[in-house]
């Protein structure tokens, strides 16, 4: 009762009863005592010194493993990586494990619970209230953290309004456990292009994002999302995928129906950039990618097919590629059974595109589209997908650390274990440079000097 009363008092100050309910639900779901939760959420004081003893360290800078390294933490930051712990110091012993920087997932949806078919999506928008979805979202945020993702970029609430802003803020205020979050609030698309679709014209149904038409309305929508707390702007640039032969022998081109006009896209990108907000574009195929690159977005999401000329432009302009491989494989069978067999063809096309992107020198950031698959599935499966598609384990790890931090503009704070950066540390048994699948078994997670998993 005391915890509920305290939570109610604090949340009323923030005018958000939803966050309070979500906090209580997340605590109960985790099966932790309130005392343990309080200890784990305590913000590290500036003078608190802790030492983490690692059997091996991959610091995210050189990717050359160093053996028997002790990391000194002061408050929520790393102080040094070459200082022995004095007698009587607080030491977390990970001498049997490999330590590495907290991981970064640059494409998530904490407010989705799996989206294989249209029915899966419709159910969540029609039968789950925004409040209920927010509660589930707080649990998913905690799962992301315990999987080892200490930072995520959540790219759209899919009909849950601005709940991502509340979750982000509650995490930042240590009300609930979760990763650092950059959020995109409501994504943007044109009328008639995004679910819910196919209902009778006289039936009013919710939509998974904000519908906008015309350059002026597009600018207004960007301003609205920023005013409600968006760190990023998310746009949907294509739909209606189909395959046809390309100009080269054996080439398959994944084509599409573009959504926004180039003028509309340019208006949104210009407005976002004027207000110091980057833009992520859902662009799966030929035209959506090309228009997004021409408009100057900051990242291409999915990119199952990207023409060579656009890959060259992305490399030249510094546009990031967030491929989300695993989710495409996860949903393909279900969507094919629903009447869209193109999703089965897209797997091979995606692999071919990924290999060309690597060769072209495009910056590739790790992103999973978690929420597109159930959050009980470990998003770290994406690492194995990236290696199977042609990356080395080191490249895959770099995509989820240094490259991810650069995409998010957080390279001064995260992405490596070095003095001055946040004490975001994860640990695994085994060597992820030899077998990236060990990242699916992370058993120690620290964010900002606070232990959320393991290390007792």
Which sequence ranges carry the predicted segments?
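Metal-associated gating/positioning segment near the N- to mid-region
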Residues: 97-175, 191-194, 198-201, 295
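Histidine-rich, glycine-flanked metal-binding segment
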Residues: 36-37, 42-48, 57, 62-100
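Bacterial N-terminal signal peptides
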Residues: 16-27
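Active-site gating loops and adjacent loop-to-helix segments of metal-dependent hydrolytic enzymes
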Residues: 111-133, 191-206, 241-259, 316-347
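Histidine/acidic residue-rich metal-binding segments in metalloenzymes
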Residues: 214-237, 242-321, 345-364
